[in-house]
Amino acid sequence: MKVSKIYTTIDAHVAGEPLRIITGGVPEIKGETQLERRAYCMEHLDYLREILMYEPRGHHGMYGCIITPPASAHADFGVLFMHNEGWSTMCGHGIIAVITVGIETGMFEVTGEKQKFIIDSPAGEVIAYATYSGSEVESVSFENVPSFVYKKDVPIKIDSYEFQVDIAFGGAFYAVVDSKEFGLKVDFKDLSAIQMWGGKIKHYIESKMEVKHPLEEGLKGIYGVIFSDDPKEKDATLRNVTIFADGQVDRSPCGTGTSARIATLFAKDALQKGEIFVHECITDGKFEGEVLSVTAVHTYEAVVPKVTGNAFITGFHQFVVDPRDDLNRGFLLG
């Protein structure tokens, strides 16, 4: 066997949504800010994303992360996230998993019963809190970037279907739609149809309008489509599944999507400040969310959302690349 590259990772999941944290084999990432570092990765390190996200080492639903030095003077560290299509601007389930893995493996030093972390992401500063007992993390909460409704009640016409979506930002831009518009339930049996509609809705919106953050040009485009449904469990508020990137299914309630959903509910007076919002996902996992404070992003009313969940480590891996392998960059099915 010939080996040209070796990568080490720690894998975890949050309500079934994977996160592969790359702990070894990453070259220097250049850039002063996390957005600049993201742009550098997109241009120079996309081979690394393909190797570790694609089959045979990953799969269509894999998600990844690189922990970087902080970009700002007061942050503890930075994060860069990746998926089947490229490099994302923020990832809520990723924050929950990174903090859990960091504490439970001794990567992060902690004191007391609750630890605060300041994290630089391409979307902005995120503050996370871990509640733990010894080396076991019980839950992680994060205060996300200011989240807001970009456009309400956007009319959509696809084939014979006419409906409306809300476009909201929660670290990335999402279109929010009721699954009942298509006669679908957020369940495994309807997932293929939901994926199909997710792709169509994303393509339609991006063909009709430019969606761009008012303060940061690097934050633009529809990242995902959130399909909302009635919950299965009595303690949940809503059920959802998010289709993002290239038809990728978020198994978790989606942290940035939950933040966007909190913003839409608050804007429609369906969620009050301090009220607990329980977001259920397709695997029946749950995130808790709430509005911590009200703020503004340029001319948009915004909220600072808090999202809480937990994660579990699934493995410690060492991946190699053999230069003789015609599939050493990987491939993607799905």
From Swiss-Prot:
Catalyzes the dehydration of trans-3-hydroxy-L-proline (t3LHyp) to Delta(1)-pyrroline-2-carboxylate (Pyr2C). Is likely involved in a degradation pathway that converts t3LHyp to L-proline, which allows B.cereus to grow on t3LHyp as a sole carbon source. Displays no proline racemase activity. The keyword Lyase applies. Belongs to the proline racemase family. It comes from the Bacteria. Induction: Is up-regulated when the bacterium is grown on t4LHyp or t3LHyp as sole carbon source. Keywords: Lyase. This is Trans-3-hydroxy-L-proline dehydratase. GO terms for molecular function: 4-hydroxyproline epimerase activity; trans-L-3-hydroxyproline dehydratase activity. The active site is at C91. Its EC number is 4.2.1.77. Coiled coil: none annotated. Transmembrane segments: none annotated. InterPro entries: Pro_racemase_fam. It catalyses: trans-3-hydroxy-L-proline = 1-pyrroline-2-carboxylate + H2O. Substrate binds at G92, H93, D250, G255, T256.
